[in-house]
């Protein structure tokens, strides 16, 4: 399969149809700015909802210059090991387990 190559054609990259006598889809241009001050434009369809943030080519996130600011994301507090333990056992059960383990350790030391 690697022997056969389509020469002179880039699949999916180029349209060989001319742009004459064709109306392009209506577009709107959204301008974004990154934290380091770089501004860039992204074309959207006229009826598309413009997002408040967009990832720039340099990898930084840009915010919309004109329009609604994005809503801050809700941050969930991190679940700790203790939180997960309390989901499975009550404090009374944990105290009982602690007593059992302490008795086992003490009996090993004696014997």
Swiss-Prot record:
Keywords assigned by UniProt, alphabetized: Transcription, Transcription regulation
Residue ranges of the region described as Not required for interaction with SigB: 1-24
Chain residue ranges for the region called Required for oligomerization and to complement a conditional disruption mutant: 80-111
GO MF entry, a single one: bacterial-type RNA polymerase holo enzyme binding
One cellular-component annotation, GO: peptidoglycan-based cell wall
Biotech uses: This protein is only found in actinomycetes; as it is essential in M.tuberculosis, it might make a potential drug target.
GO biological process, one term: positive regulation of DNA-templated transcription
InterPro entries xref list: RbpA_sf, RNApol-bd_RbpA
Disruption outcome: Essential for growth, it cannot be disrupted.
HAMAP family: RbpA (MF_01483)
Record note on quaternary structure: Oligomerizes at more than 3 uM; this requires the C-terminal 32 residues. Forms a complex with the RNAP catalytic core, specifically with the beta subunit (rpoB). Interacts with free SigB, probably as a 1:1 complex, and also with free SigA, probably via its sigma-2 domain.
Cited function: Binds to RNA polymerase (RNAP), stimulating and stabilizing the formation of stable RNAP promoter complexes up to 2-fold from principal sigma factor SigA-dependent but not alternative sigma factor SigF-dependent promoters. Increases the affinity of core RNAP for SigA, increasing the transcriptional activity of RNAP. Unlike the case in M.smegmatis or S.coelicolor, has no effect on rifampicin inhibition of transcription. Has no effect on E.coli RNAP.
Family: Belongs to the RNA polymerase-binding protein RbpA family.
Protein name (Swiss-Prot/TrEMBL): RNA polymerase-binding protein RbpA
Organism (species): Mycobacterium tuberculosis (strain ATCC 25618 / H37Rv)
Upper taxonomic lineage: Bacteria, Bacillati, Actinomycetota, Actinomycetes, Mycobacteriales
